A protein has these predicted regions:
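Short catalytic/metal-binding and nucleic-acid-binding patches
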Residues: 1-162
Length: 162
């Protein structure tokens, strides 16, 4: 999974976004919300803090405070995406979503196939922004919480309802 930009700091608060491949609603289809929660729980056991998040049908926004990490933050996020992808594929197989699994397989690049990657669950890499001020963190929290209530989603009338 190529990384667009490396996070070079071992600590900090970051607004992270990662998206399902071709914006497919894989999280919703597989009822994979608990997979994200499990990853958050894992991060907490490592001393990191989940300051806010929203799990949408096809993407995740999270405000995460990474603390004293012995791994690069990009690696932590990449490992989380791999764990979640593995479980999503497992659920798609259980749901007998053969056509979708085939599409996800066809999306894997040749060099990734050589490394035994079988399905493309996520868009490459992830987006991130470092949050250096309380005002910026509040802006990102408000954006996340409003996300399900706006635009094409309209999944809830108010953030508290989602």
């Amino acid at each position: 999974m190529p990384v667009k930009r490396q996070i070079t700091e071992p600590n900090g608060v970051f607004f992270i976004t990662f998206t399902c491949h071709q914006w497919k609603s894989l999280i919703n289809l597989t009822k994979g919300y608990n997979l994200i929660y499990n990853w958050f729980d894992h991060l907490k056991t490592k001393g990191h803090f989940i300051n806010g998040y929203v799990i949408m049908p096809n993407h995740v926004h999270a405000l995460i405070a990474f603390r004293n990490s012995n791994q690069p933050i990009n690696t932590i996020i990449g490992n989380g995406k791999r764990f979640i992808a593995y479980e999503i594929i497992k659920r798609l197989k259980e749901l007998k979503e053969d056509k979708l699994l085939h599409q996800l397989h066809l999306s894997v690049e040749a060099k990734e196939l050589e490394r035994n990657k079988k399905h493309e669950v996520w868009e490459d890499s992830f987006d991130w922004k470092e949050c250096r001020t309380n005002e910026y963190m509040l802006q990102k929290l408000n954006y996340m919480h409003d996300n399900p209530c706006k635009g094409k989603w309209n999944l809830a009338a108010a953030p508290v309802d989602y």
